[in-house]
């Protein structure tokens, strides 16, 4: 067995990046193909083999596995310090909950139903669901929901409810919607019409109106984004409802709110459109491992009780009814979410939101001060900027990229100091790209607006912002 170990290799002239050589985790802009990945697993000693019959060999292999695991922990610790492009909150300590990992907890079926199995965490799950019901203004006897495997499952569930209520409905989703929304349309064989977006990533309501008016005979199933994946744009629920009703869709529409990241943040912003079941929406989903932070992917989906009943089925084997997508569900996630919400409360979450938003504004200004095109939506902790020319920078800082753009999601664990180091490094490398190698600075006016573009054409007309 090749032991897992962390080593430092040069990624550029000024900085080092870690590589776990035995895992084949190289700093490269290229993705490994399926065959390459299989070869890496075999080559690096990660292929699963039967334990040796000889006691000494078995003991040696056991020690090797321990070293491999310890090395991988070291690798994850190091790489977590350079994680900027994806919405994960690493700022937590769940060590007091470690004893729960000695139990296999399965919250199969309806979390509110009695079951024969006693090894579960349903009471924690219901407590978490009640918290979110209060968060989104729905009375406890008027909602149903469950803890999901993440934002995608929440979208799949919410849009399935919409499809069941309106079997002949058309799904309307903006171009900036998460890919899981279009996956749901394909899975459920629902006609899907894409809606244009503004430069900020928000739904273009004029385009929504136009497309609704061309399909007035079919009910509308709307996916509203409370924070788009790449730009963090927030669709205005009130504007969507108004557009639907002006187009003659009264009582013939269903709105699902994809609130994966920003759904935990916008309620703490006074200027944000309020997402609430006091409005005629059908469901809301949010991720638990993003802003809240959780070791395992998870999420929450809430719908109206009357809507949930269209999916409910009694299952004799588990002595419960089930309206969920997956059936078996992670019973540890509810405990971790309950623990976080209990420790932080509204005041703690409010504080974290303000810190993240402040740091996001700082990053946007800092990028612009060194001449880098950048933009940050008012209600978002996501900063979009010019994609680095060197993919090693993308890899080192684990940036998410789309076309000419990259983005950083400023989470609670992303500090002021870390952002400063990143911008200093990027600015230094950028001089090499544009001065020494003669690259042209790309124009991003179409992507983020000319007021945020620092290309040669637009930079002369802009003022450098101050802190």
Curated annotation (Swiss-Prot):
The keyword Calcium does not apply. Its cofactor is pyridoxal 5'-phosphate. GO terms for molecular function: pyridoxal phosphate binding; serine decarboxylase activity. Its EC number is 4.1.1.-. Signal peptide: none annotated. The modification N6-(pyridoxal phosphate)lysine is found at residue 290. Substrate binds at residue 178. Pfam families: Pyridoxal_deC. It comes from the Eukaryota. Keywords: Decarboxylase, Lyase, Pyridoxal phosphate. It is an enzyme of class 4 (lyase). GO terms for biological process: carboxylic acid metabolic process. It catalyses: L-serine + H(+) = ethanolamine + CO2. Belongs to the group II decarboxylase family. Catalyzes the biosynthesis of ethanolamine from serine. Decarboxylation of free serine is the major source of ethanolamine production in plants and ethanolamine metabolism is crucial for the synthesis of choline, phosphatidylethanolamine (PE) and phosphatidylcholine (PC), and thus for plant growth. This is Serine decarboxylase 2. It comes from Oryza sativa subsp. japonica.
């Amino acid at each position: 067995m090749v032991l897992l170990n962390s080593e430092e290799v040069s990624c550029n002239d000024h900085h080092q990046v870690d590589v776990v050589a035995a895992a084949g985790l190289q700093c490269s802009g290229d993705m490994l193909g399926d065959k390459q990945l299989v070869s890496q697993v075999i080559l690096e000693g990660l292929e699963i083999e039967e334990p040796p019959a000889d006691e000494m060999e078995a003991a040696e292999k056991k020690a090797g596995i321990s070293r491999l695991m310890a090395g991988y922990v070291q690798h994850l610790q190091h790489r977590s310090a350079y994680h900027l492009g994806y919405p994960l909150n690493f700022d937590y300590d769940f060590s007091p909950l470690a004893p729960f990992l000695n139990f296999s907890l399965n919250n199969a079926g309806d979390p509110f139903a009695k079951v024969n199995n006693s090894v579960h965490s349903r009471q924690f799950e219901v407590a978490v669901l009640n918290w979110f019901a209060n968060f989104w203004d729905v009375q406890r006897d008027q909602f149903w929901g469950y803890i999901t495997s993440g934002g995608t499952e929440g979208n799949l569930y919410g849009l399935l409810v919409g499809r069941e209520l309106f079997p002949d409905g058309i799904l309307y989703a903006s171009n900036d919607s998460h890919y899981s929304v279009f996956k749901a349309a394909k899975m459920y064989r629902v006609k899907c019409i894409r809606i244009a977006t503004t430069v900020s990533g928000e739904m273009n309501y004029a385009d929504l109106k136009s497309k609704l008016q061309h399909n007035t005979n079919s009910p509308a199933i709307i996916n509203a984004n409370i924070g788009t994946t790449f730009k963090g744009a927030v669709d205005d629920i009130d504007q969507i409802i108004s557009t639907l009703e002006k187009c003659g869709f009264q009582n013939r529409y269903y709105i699902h709110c994809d609130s994966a990241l920003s759904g935990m943040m916008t309620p703490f912003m006074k200027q944000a459109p309020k997402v609430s079941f006091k409005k005629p929406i059908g469901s809301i989903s949010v991720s638990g491992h993003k802003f809240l932070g959780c070791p395992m992917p998870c999420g929450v989906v809430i719908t109206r009780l009357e809507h949930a009943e269209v999916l409910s089925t009694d299952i004799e084997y588990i002595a419960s009814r089930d309206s969920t997508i997956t059936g078996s569900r992670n019973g540890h996630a509810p405990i971790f979410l309950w623990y976080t919400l209990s420790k932080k409360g509204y005041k703690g979450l409010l504080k974290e939101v303000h810190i993240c938003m402040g740091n996001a504004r700082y990053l946007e200004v800092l990028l612009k001060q060194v001449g880098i095109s950048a933009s940050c939506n008012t209600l978002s902790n996501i900063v979009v900027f010019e994609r680095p020319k060197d993919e090693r920078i993308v890899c080192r800082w684990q940036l998410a990229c789309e076309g000419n753009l990259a983005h950083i999601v400023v989470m609670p664990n992303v500090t002021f100091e870390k952002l400063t180091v990143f911008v200093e490094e990027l600015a230094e490398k950028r001089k090499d790209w544009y001065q020494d190698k003669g690259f042209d600075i790309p124009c991003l006016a179409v992507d983020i607006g000319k007021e945020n573009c620092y290309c040669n054409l637009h930079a002369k007309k802009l003022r450098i912002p101050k802190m």
